[in-house]
């Protein structure tokens, strides 16, 4: 049984930054530090930060007065930002800069009077935050997930539309929705550069390469991680047995029964330690020393909020 590792895999620059913001805030201000929503969608990471003194909440009403609060990597709505400001809470924003880029696109289109079609998954915190950035009462922002949604879509002005996308979607699926939008609304504007983030694209390209070499794919990631789910779906669509597992404890012999080549990758919010634990388990079951595929070397680094850098200098 051969083990092949995807490259790149695991943490992206936005996740690294978000986790470091929480770590630094705890170091500087001491526990408790409040975090609105899970800072990243990974159980291992969240549990580790909770042990250090992070308190995860879903509503700002759960945050006591005079507290420090961190917004998660997924971003928040304008309403949440304003509520924190009105209450005088000390806020550190761990929103991924690539999500912030989409927020800026939404602001620009709204200020220029356009309505927006947002390609994303209902209920995901990034979607809720981005849709909550639209503030033109004369227009609207509409969520679609599929070409079928586009067919049913009703907007106020079909000639004055733009679209943006959730950063963690499948590139292939997004492309089909964009094509449907352009067919239905020929004048629709899109972003100058694709909203799908570099790390999402790189990991999807890597899992496709992995699927070409392996008969079974294991994706390390939590079930609420959008980009991890997309990796599993891509491998599945390519005809491979594909499983999403949080950690080695969820790995079963049935998953790898009869496999000659097992590919292992990890979502952008999954730490490498979990990948190594999965590899160790596979080796116990007879797997050979893992080899890595060649892939893009990621050198992207996002800086911390200047206030936190200054406080921690």
Swiss-Prot record:
InterPro entries in the cross-refs: LytB/IspH
GO molecular function annotations of the record: 4 iron, 4 sulfur cluster binding; 4-hydroxy-3-methylbut-2-enyl diphosphate reductase activity; metal ion binding
Q: Kind of enzyme, top EC level?
A: oxidoreductase
Q: What is its pathway?
A: Isoprenoid biosynthesis; dimethylallyl diphosphate biosynthesis; dimethylallyl diphosphate from (2E)-4-hydroxy-3-methylbutenyl diphosphate: step 1/1; Isoprenoid biosynthesis; isopentenyl diphosphate biosynthesis via DXP pathway; isopentenyl diphosphate from 1-deoxy-D-xylulose 5-phosphate: step 6/6
- In short, the EC number is 1.17.7.4
Biological role: Catalyzes the conversion of 1-hydroxy-2-methyl-2-(E)-butenyl 4-diphosphate (HMBPP) into a mixture of isopentenyl diphosphate (IPP) and dimethylallyl diphosphate (DMAPP). Acts in the terminal step of the DOXP/MEP pathway for isoprenoid precursor biosynthesis.
Q: Which family does it belong to?
A: Belongs to the IspH family.
Protein encoded by which gene: ispH
According to the lineage, what is the superkingdom?
A: Bacteria
Would the keyword Iron turn up in this protein's UniProt record?
A: yes
Catalysis: reaction(s): isopentenyl diphosphate + 2 oxidized [2Fe-2S]-[ferredoxin] + H2O = (2E)-4-hydroxy-3-methylbut-2-enyl diphosphate + 2 reduced [2Fe-2S]-[ferredoxin] + 2 H(+); dimethylallyl diphosphate + 2 oxidized [2Fe-2S]-[ferredoxin] + H2O = (2E)-4-hydroxy-3-methylbut-2-enyl diphosphate + 2 reduced [2Fe-2S]-[ferredoxin] + 2 H(+)
Q: Does the keyword Heme apply?
A: no
Keyword vocabulary terms for this entry: 4Fe-4S, Iron, Iron-sulfur, Isoprene biosynthesis, Metal-binding, Oxidoreductase
According to the entry, what is the taxonomic lineage of the organism?
Answer: Bacteria, Pseudomonadati, Pseudomonadota, Gammaproteobacteria, Methylococcales
Q: How is the cofactor bound?
A: Binds 1 [4Fe-4S] cluster per subunit.
So where does (2E)-4-hydroxy-3-methylbut-2-enyl diphosphate get bound?
41, 74, 124, 167, 225-227, 269
Point out the signal peptide segment: none
Quote the record's binding site residues for dimethylallyl diphosphate.
41, 74, 124, 225-227, 269
The cofactor named in the record is:
[4Fe-4S] cluster
Q: What is this protein called?
A: 4-hydroxy-3-methylbut-2-enyl diphosphate reductase
Query: Per UniProt, where does [4Fe-4S] cluster bind?
Result: 12, 96, 197
> Binding residues for isopentenyl diphosphate, per the UniProt record?
41, 74, 124, 225-227, 269
